[in-house]
Amino acid sequence: MGDLARLPLLEKAPTTHAGLLAWVEEVAELTQPDRIHWVDGTEEEYTRLTGELVEAGTLTRLNPELFPNSFAAFSDPADVARVEEQTFICSENQRDAGFTNNWMAPAEMKQKLRGLFAGSMRGRTMYVIPFVMGHLDAEDPKFGVEITDSAYVVASMRIMANIGTEVLDKITATNAFFVPALHSLGAPLAPGQADVAWPCNPDKWIVHFPEERSIWSFGSGYGGNALLGKKCYALRIASVMARDEGWLAEHMLILKLTSPEKKSYYMSAAFPSACGKTNLALLDPTIEGWEVETLGDDITWMRIGKEGELRATNPEAGLFGVAPGTGWGTNPNAMRAIAKGHSIFTNVALTDDGGVWWEGMTEETPAHLTDWQGNSWTPDSDKPAAHPNSRFCTPISQIDMLAEEYYSPEGVELSAILFGGRRKTTVPLVTQARSWTNGIFMGSTLSSETTAAAAGQVGVLRRDPMAMLPFIGYDAGDYLKHWISVSGKANPERLPHIFLVNWFRRTADGDFAWPGFGDNARVLKWAIERIEGKADAIETPIGFVPAGHALDLTGLDLTHAHVEDAVRVDREEWDAELASIEEWYAKFGDSLPEALRAELDALKERMADHS
């Protein structure tokens, strides 16, 4: 083992998995850590690591009376979000990465990365984190091992995934395949050099090698760049595995809706960021007798079941939510889960009594805070107290409304799939697709107007197919073909119905056309009644929308005319929309599925007859 005589922990490795041992040895030789620690996932280990992080200044321990066993971290201001421009899909063939991804030849990228990782863990501990996405006792568990030099990553991964000794034992016992996920902060320490609270490197690379199912992440300690089980594995690499193995890995929530008659239905829903995905996952219905429970708020893996049905599971163990806008008024269920503690907050503000705060958390703004950069803050300050992309990392088990089916390895049968964007005009409140392929067309053209939070021009349309634009691990046209192909593998009678929703439509005078939040349960109720063949709908060129009387408006100060306005299909608006879709589809070139081109042509014909 040559240079590894100084790494005695490798000799005492708690596994005999030859492939894993060889990889750990290779990484240790490359990165030169001072020591290796195999993560066991225990509470004792978590307590020790978080204690060390508090001593190092990386974590601040919160007031245990307010947030038990919870911590706040504050990142380098240059390390606050996913770095899409430095995220690469290095497929062997450039065509397989497609127009939505950055690409570099794998050999060239590996050479670059080896140069960056050489000696990158000097002076640090190398942590080996065995993890499984989803259930350890699933029929086909999806394993990963993350190597990192960040104890903050270890602590966060303990919340977000199933990690530790039990997972490693199963990887070893079954000689299982695992996704190797290598992460380094890129901040080696020379002997005697003082560390900083948030080590990182200005040169950041988040790289995926789809054919070999591997991930290399360098330079960032933040969220989706560093917790490699999340977007990197569960979406980018898993979407490629799903294509090859006949399933789907999607950026979706899963909810359970139970009617007054105690009949339950399961839905998944895809929304781009800032469109209310977590709020819908944790919905409090405003209609009597209907109940919502959640199975997940961000990632859904879907497989075809034994009877041709589409079954969904959530591969994650935690919530990694955007904090600003999550509040007692808008999402009390999320707040109740967070209030139980056992959470790590990143780039939020601190209250004077040792709690946390962010914009939108409470109606009243505290008179004084310490902002995410450590400055004294008052409501007169000209900058937000919490970073707009600040996060809470909380165990999903703390959600009171967590459905028991979350724990089932078989998952749940989906009755409906929702796609939703943020549009002031054009797109109705809710539209039922005519068919599976028509629903894929809706998903493929999903769009949102950019908000002030996004860089660039406000109000510009951003197409985001299935809300997966930053996460598709291969060519986007092939991805849409794969979605269409599911109908050929499934029982057509058991396929979920697809709906397009838009909670953000405005009236002519600029008000929201629909109250949203808990009242969105009324739209879900209509969708279920459509599936059951009970609710009335009006056929439009784009699909079926509710008849004015078909939405349950009990207790709302709305009329059937309001509903008719919220679902109106305007010919002029759609002429502009069709031109915009043409531009979008042109970007796919010859990888656009013929079936979607046919859907667009058919929609144009129907629209031509629409007054």
Swiss-Prot record:
Its EC number is 4.1.1.32. It holds the Pfam family PEPCK_N. GO terms for molecular function: GTP binding; manganese ion binding; phosphoenolpyruvate carboxykinase (GTP) activity. The active site is at C275. It is found in: Cytoplasm. Keywords: Cytoplasm, Decarboxylase, Gluconeogenesis, GTP-binding, Lyase, Manganese, Metal-binding, Nucleotide-binding. CDD domains: PEPCK_GTP. One of its GO terms (cellular component) is cytosol. One of its GO terms (biological process) is oxaloacetate metabolic process. InterPro entries: PEP_carboxykin_GTP_CS, PEP_carboxykinase_C, PEP_carboxykinase_GTP, PEP_carboxykinase_GTP_C, PEP_carboxykinase_GTP_N, PEP_carboxykinase_N. GTP binds at A274, C275, G276, K277, T278, N279, R391, R422, F517, G518, D519, N520. Its cofactor is Mn(2+). The keyword Membrane does not apply. NCBIfam families: PRK04210.1 (NF003253). This is Phosphoenolpyruvate carboxykinase [GTP]. It comes from Arthrobacter sp. (strain FB24). The gene is pckG.
